[in-house]
């Protein structure tokens, strides 16, 4: 296990212990960076990328067991989030200069095929998609950070929202059964992370600008952040909340963006 050193950070981000199968570092090859990670069936999956700008970015979904690694699929653009559903299919949020997309990836003996599922909302291009979460009932939740331009990627969109505080972030839900898209909650000042409770009944949403995590009934629709039936599960956070992760025992992990050291809370 690796224990974070006791270093005071100007951001005040919470420090905690980290471990990964008794290894401190999982090598992923010559990629420029990693956007997001998940663990599934004993493997670690990471969205690794090359390309300094969004126009040139190519992202691979890389799988590793701590020893060898392999890229199982590739997309053009920024792979901002991914989640496994109950059937083992992958759901992805992908951002390109043309806008965002919710995609589904399926695997067979020929490899992985990625299809775009949602690219527009009410006729307008999907914005800066930032996160995705799959529920046990098959429904797929995805977040749009805000109404900012997507030309420079998710990071730039979130920074703009942090300064402008427009509160134009939304969380949507896609139902594969009838291919419908519904709005879950709006008014988020930088929707940057999603998590579902182990039973799939409660949805958690990171609000970057308000430095809090909202919670609501996963079946709720057309809510407003901070309004009726949408309460703050964690407020006054010492950092800017980003990705969320839920353990089987109900423990919620919150990552902070732009901290001097990227510890989890």
Q: Where do the language-model regions lie?
A:
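Asp-box/WD-like beta-propeller blade repeats and closely related beta-sheet repeat scaffolds
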Residues: 95-136, 143-150, 154-159
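A short helix->beta-strand "capping" segment at the edge of beta-propeller domains
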Residues: 2-32, 66-67
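Beta-rich, blade/repeat-based domains predominating
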Residues: 29-42, 58, 75-94, 121-140, ...
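A short loop-to-beta-strand structural motif that recurs across blades of beta-propeller domains
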Residues: 58-62, 101-104, 169-172, 212-214
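Short, conserved, GDST-rich strand-edge loop motifs in beta-rich repeat architectures
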Residues: 48-56, 142-166, 257-265
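A short beta-strand motif characteristic of beta-propeller blades
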Residues: 22-28, 68-74, 114-122, 180-185, ...
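Short loop/turn segments that connect beta-strands within beta-propeller blades
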Residues: 64-68, 106-110, 174-179, 217-221
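Beta-propeller domains
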Residues: 45-70
């Amino acid at each position: 296990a690796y224990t974070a050193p006791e270093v005071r950070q100007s951001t005040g981000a919470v420090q905690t212990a980290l471990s990964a199968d008794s290894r401190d570092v999982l090598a992923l090859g010559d990629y420029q960076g990693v956007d997001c990670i998940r663990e599934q069936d004993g493997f670690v999956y990471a969205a690794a990328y090359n390309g300094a700008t969004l126009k040139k970015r190519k992202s691979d979904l890389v799988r590793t067991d701590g020893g060898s690694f392999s890229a199982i699929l590739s997309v053009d653009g920024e792979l901002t989030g991914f989640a496994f559903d109950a059937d083992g299919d992958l759901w992805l949020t992908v951002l390109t200069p043309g806008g965002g997309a919710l995609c589904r990836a399926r695997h067979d003996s020929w490899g992985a095929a990625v299809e775009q599922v949602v690219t527009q909302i009410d006729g307008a291009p999907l914005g800066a998609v930032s996160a995705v979460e799959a529920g046990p009932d098959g429904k797929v939740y995805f977040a749009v950070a805000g109404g900012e331009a997507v030309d420079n990627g998710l990071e730039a969109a979130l920074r703009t929202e942090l300064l402008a505080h427009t509160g134009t972030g939304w969380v949507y839900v896609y139902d594969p059964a009838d291919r419908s898209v519904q709005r879950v909650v709006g008014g988020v000042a930088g929707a940057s992370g999603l998590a579902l409770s182990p039973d799939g009944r409660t949805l958690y949403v990171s609000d970057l600008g308000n430095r809090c995590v909202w919670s609501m009934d996963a079946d709720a629709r057309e809510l407003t952040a901070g309004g009726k039936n949408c309460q703050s599960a964690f407020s006054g956070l010492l950092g800017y909340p980003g990705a969320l992760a839920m353990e089987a025992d109900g423990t919620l992990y919150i990552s902070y963006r732009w901290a001097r050291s990227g510890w989890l809370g």
